[in-house]
Structures are given as C-alpha cells and as structure tokens.
Design a protein with these regions (language model features):
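Bacterial N-terminal signal peptides that target proteins for export
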Residues: 1-8
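Hydrophobic h-region of N-terminal signal peptides that target proteins for export
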Residues: 9-19
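Low-complexity, serine/threonine/proline/glycine-rich extracellular segments that form mucin-like
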Residues: 21-22, 26-119
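Extracellular secreted precursors and ectodomains with disulfide-bonded cysteine-rich loops/domains
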Residues: 28, 41, 91, 106, ...
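Ser/Thr/Pro-rich, low-complexity mucin-like regions
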Residues: 58-63, 141-207
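Short beta-strand elements
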Residues: 197-227
Length: 242
C-alpha cells in the first residue's frame, strides 16, 4: 500500500513540475516546430535564405514583459571570420545579407505577438578580441502600456535572424561559405516596466544542447564550448542604438 502511494505521489509530482526554463536555438523553426540543429549548404547559389530562430521557456509567469535582450555568439573554424560571415558593418562583404525580425510558430507563439513590437539588431565582429568570433545582439520591445503577460512552461519565439545567400557564388562573391561555424544562444534578459534594467535572466539551455546550432557541421569549432559566455549588460546593449 505504501509503495503504491509513493508511486502515485511521484507520478503526480512529475505531472505538476514546471518544465525547465531556458534557451533554444534552431534553424528555420523554433524547437517545438522541428527546427534543425545543423545546416549543410552546398554554397552553390545566391538565392534563398535560412532563419536562425531564438526561442525561450520561462521558469515562472511574468505578467507584463516590455523588453527582451538576446545575445548569440558565433565562432568559425578558420583563424579569422570569413567574409561570408561579415554583416551589417559598412563596407563588410555581405553588409545587407542579414536581417532581424520577430518569430511566431505553430507551437511557439510570438513573444510580443499581439503588440506593436520594435526589433533592433547589431552584429559585432571580434567582440572578445578573437578574430574568428562575432556576436549578434537584439532588443525587442513594446511600449509599457502594451506589456505582455507570459507563462512558465510555454515555448515562445522571440527572434529570427534571416541569413541570405547573396554573394555566395559568381562575381562579386564572399569567401568562406563552406567554413564550419558554431552559434550559441548565450543569454536572454526580460524586463517589465517596474524592474528595468534588472529583469529576469536566462543563461542555460532549456534542454541539453538546445541552445546551439552548427553550420556545415561545426567541425573544428569545439562547439558549443568555443563561444564566450560573458553577458552584455542591458545598458551597454541599449547604447548601441543611441
């Protein structure tokens, strides 16, 4: 009888325990919509694109999120970051081949889906003094009056970085598409109108290995340990847009 009671108690605890909070990174879709962990691209076309999707699972309910800050780090297997992976900065080989938007999927509702959201992104090469490393920073926010309630255990899509295939072949083109790369979703911070700039920080994978993806297999990058885990402060991220 005691054994049966104990078994029932364990089953009940398992059923009611909150899912682990954390970060998910996947190609093309969020984790819950069968996003994939690796992209193997033949590097034979200038058309098409793929999406790098950041999603999260909260460990507690937050009634009025107004802003989110995301940090994704990447490292290449080469000694220096290939030209194919140089975006946004004036004069970079693929300056306009990277763009940022929110993400909403079937099993991962958009983090700010029902609000007028602003998405701002930055791309920093050699952020930590490493010539083969870069950092993607993004801020997503709504007006305080439009702050949105979020709930523990639900996967939410937040960001989609779209990487286009422009300048892969022909002339002019940018070398390095075939180079393996590792990308790691290192942190996400959420703030409400009341707790800015402290907020709630997530800095671990929702499931083992769910916070990193690879490009061309990622060989030679020591993925995911190769990327820095030092988080950028909220204030320093916002200063990028002033």
């Amino acid at each position: 009888m005691k054994q049966a009671f104990l078994s029932c108690a364990l089953l009940l605890a398992a059923a009611t325990a909150a899912p682990a909070a954390g970060l998910n990174l996947a190609w093309n879709n969020c984790a819950g919509d069968a996003g994939v962990q690796n992209i193997a691209f033949a590097c034979d076309t200038n058309t098409g694109s793929r999406g790098l999707v950041c999603s999260i699972v909260l460990g507690r309910d937050i009634p009025d999120v107004a802003q989110s800050e995301l940090v994704v780090d990447l490292v290449s297997a080469s000694a220096t970051l290939p030209d194919w992976w140089r975006f946004l900065t004036a004069g970079s080989c693929r300056q306009v081949s990277l763009s940022l938007s929110g993400h909403e999927g079937t099993n991962c509702p958009g983090f700010f889906a029902q609000s007028a959201v602003t998405n701002n992104g930055a791309y920093q090469v050699g952020k930590h003094g490493l010539p083969n490393e870069a950092r993607l920073l993004s801020i997503h926010g709504v007006l305080a009056a439009d702050a949105v309630a979020h709930f523990a255990g639900q996967e939410y899509g937040i960001a989609r970085w779209t990487i286009m295939n422009t300048k892969t072949v022909g002339a002019p083109s940018c070398a390095g598409c075939q180079t393996p790369v590792c990308l790691v979703f290192n942190s996400a911070r959420f703030t409400t109108p009341a707790d800015t700039p402290v907020g709630t920080l997530l800095a671990a994978a929702a499931n083992p290995g769910s916070n990193f993806v690879t490009w061309q297999g990622g060989a030679g990058t020591n993925c995911p340990e190769a990327t820095p885990t030092r988080n950028t402060t909220w204030g320093s991220v916002k200063s990028l847009y002033r």
